[in-house]
Amino acid sequence: MNIFRLTGDLSHLAAIVILLLKIWKTRSCAGISGKSQLLFALVFTTRYLDLFTSFISLYNTSMKVIYLACSYATVYLIYLKFKATYDGNHDTFRVEFLVVPVGGLSFLVNHDFSPLEILWTFSIYLESVAILPQLFMISKTGEAETITTHYLFFLGLYRALYLVNWIWRFYFEGFFDLIAVVAGVVQTILYCDFFYLYITKVLKGKKLSLPA
């Protein structure tokens, strides 16, 4: 494992922990898109079905379990424990416009036409767009809490670091996964505008807002 994948994983984990702590400490999920969190839970569920069929390393298995547990915990907090604070009026992105095309694409473009491989491909495609309901929600409300922007920053940083990881692996290991790379590029592009606003506003103590 190279340093870029490790730091990418740590950034991803940091984003998840920040979100969970934000919800738990404030006893509120205001400003958080439950739909994005449902999509991420679906991403991890379909990606890590091989948890029961293959073992790569203790680190790999541990991270899979952590991602699954945290994603389910987040969904539980939003839709059950702190349901009264969930802003469903602004979380209105039509997720079927993401899930259906992604599902079709995973059947058409994959590495191998087997159930686990198709589901893995589905998870890669879906992860690249799963943040859209959250960004859409921010654009509707006009701004985001600082802690929410920190969550989004680390989530975007994780994907950017993984792009560097793939470049590293291509040059030093000869490994290249076109599906993962293209999906990662799409996901990183979605974060570009947010990164700019994060650096120019949030780091200077200002509120972040996305254009409606």
UniProtKB/Swiss-Prot annotation:
Q: Which residues lie on this side of the membrane: Cytoplasmic?
A: 25-32, 80-92, 136-149, 200-212
Q: What is the effect of changing residue 12 to D?
A: In OI21; changed maintenance of protein localization in endoplasmic reticulum; SERPINH1 is not retained in the endoplasmic reticulum and secreted; leads to a loss of fiber formation of the bones connective tissue; no effect on protein abundance
Extract one GO BP annotation from the record.
retrograde vesicle-mediated transport, Golgi to endoplasmic reticulum
PANTHER family named in the record = ER LUMEN PROTEIN RETAINING RECEPTOR
Q: Where in the cell is it found?
A: Endoplasmic reticulum membrane; Golgi apparatus membrane; Cytoplasmic vesicle, COPI-coated vesicle membrane
User: What are the boundaries of the region Interaction with the K-D-E-L motif on target proteins?
Assistant: 47-48, 159-169
Point out the coiled-coil segments of this chain: none
What InterPro entries does the record point to?
ER_ret_rcpt
- Lumenal domain ranges by topology: 1-4, 53-58, 111-116, 169-178
The protein's name is ER lumen protein-retaining receptor 2
Quick one: where's region Important for recycling of cargo proteins with the sequence motif K-D-E-L from the Golgi to the endoplasmic reticulum?
204-207
Entry's transmembrane regions: 5-24, 33-52, 59-79, 93-110, 117-135, 150-168, 179-199
Listed GO MF terms? ER retention sequence binding; KDEL sequence binding
* Site (Interaction with the K-D-E-L motif on target proteins) location in chain: 5, 54, 117
Q: Tell me the domain comment.
A: Binds the C-terminal sequence motif K-D-E-L in a hydrophilic cavity between the transmembrane domains. This triggers a conformation change that exposes a Lys-rich patch on the cytosolic surface of the protein. This patch mediates recycling from the Golgi to the endoplasmic reticulum, probably via COPI vesicles.
**Topology in the membrane?**
Multi-pass membrane protein
Its function, per the record, reads: Membrane receptor that binds the K-D-E-L sequence motif in the C-terminal part of endoplasmic reticulum resident proteins and maintains their localization in that compartment by participating to their vesicle-mediated recycling back from the Golgi. Binding is pH dependent, and is optimal at pH 5-5.4.
Q: Which family does it belong to?
A: Belongs to the ERD2 family.
- Which disease is given in the protein's UniProt record? Osteogenesis imperfecta 21: An autosomal recessive form of osteogenesis imperfecta, a disorder of bone formation characterized by low bone mass, bone fragility and susceptibility to fractures after minimal trauma. Disease severity ranges from very mild forms without fractures to intrauterine fractures and perinatal lethality. Extraskeletal manifestations, which affect a variable number of patients, are dentinogenesis imperfecta, hearing loss, and blue sclerae. OI21 is a progressively deforming form characterized by multiple fractures appearing at birth or early childhood.
- GO CC annotation: what is one? endoplasmic reticulum membrane
* Record PROSITE patterns: ER_LUMEN_RECEPTOR_1 (PS00951), ER_LUMEN_RECEPTOR_2 (PS00952)
Q: Which UniProt keywords apply?
A: Cytoplasmic vesicle, Disease variant, Endoplasmic reticulum, ER-Golgi transport, Golgi apparatus, Membrane, Osteogenesis imperfecta, Protein transport, Receptor, Transmembrane, Transmembrane helix, Transport
Site residues, Important for recycling of cargo proteins with the sequence motif K-D-E-L from the Golgi to the endoplasmic reticulum:
193
